[in-house]
UniProtKB/Swiss-Prot annotation:
Ni(2+) binds at H2. It comes from Synechococcus sp. (strain JA-2-3B'a(2-13)). This is Hydrogenase maturation factor HypA. Gene3D superfamilies: 3.30.2320.80. The lineage of its organism: Bacteria, Bacillati, Cyanobacteriota, Cyanophyceae, Synechococcales. Involved in the maturation of [NiFe] hydrogenases. Required for nickel insertion into the metal center of the hydrogenase. Belongs to the HypA/HybF family. Keywords: Metal-binding, Nickel, Zinc. GO terms for molecular function: nickel cation binding; zinc ion binding. The gene is hypA.
Length: 132
């Protein structure tokens, strides 16, 4: 289960960011973008995250995963398509082998939501624009 190792790396990245923040705010949600071609199982990643964040600065935070589909581009016929394993990922129009992946390999932190209510008194949230 490589999701366990990925979760460890994710937690370390989040810890490095969190320690650099004024007042070390409470993290409510971590939003990830995970491509279908990464072979990461979202349910396993969510389980590993919940287990590994117990007793840490991330305890109680939620992992939100947005999957991106595998999209390829065929240079000979100039079309984007969704590769299928049954076709050996070849272009359904002309049969050319998959050359360029345009989407589906992503594995990144999209953004982090902070729970301002739980923040320490040293943390000041950004000013909100006045509504007329």
């Amino acid at each position: 289960m490589h999701e366990t190792d990925m979760t460890r790396a994710l937690i370390q990245t989040l810890r490095d960011w969190w320690q650099s923040q004024p007042g070390q705010p409470q993290i409510a949600r971590v939003h990830l973008v995970v491509g279908q071609f990464t072979c990461v199982e979202p349910a396993s990643l969510t389980f590993a995250y919940a287990a590994q964040t117990q007793g840490t600065f991330l305890q109680g935070s939620q992992l939100v995963i947005r999957e991106t589909p595998l999209i390829a581009y065929c240079h000979p016929c100039g079309q984007e398509y969704k590769p299928e394993i049954g076709r050996r990922y070849a272009c359904p129009n002309c049969g050319s082998p998959m050359e360029e992946i345009r989407s589906g390999r992503e594995l990144k932190i999209d953004y982090i939501e902070i729970d301002y209510i739980e923040c320490s008194t040293n943390f000041t949230p950004p000013a909100q624009p006045e509504v007329a």
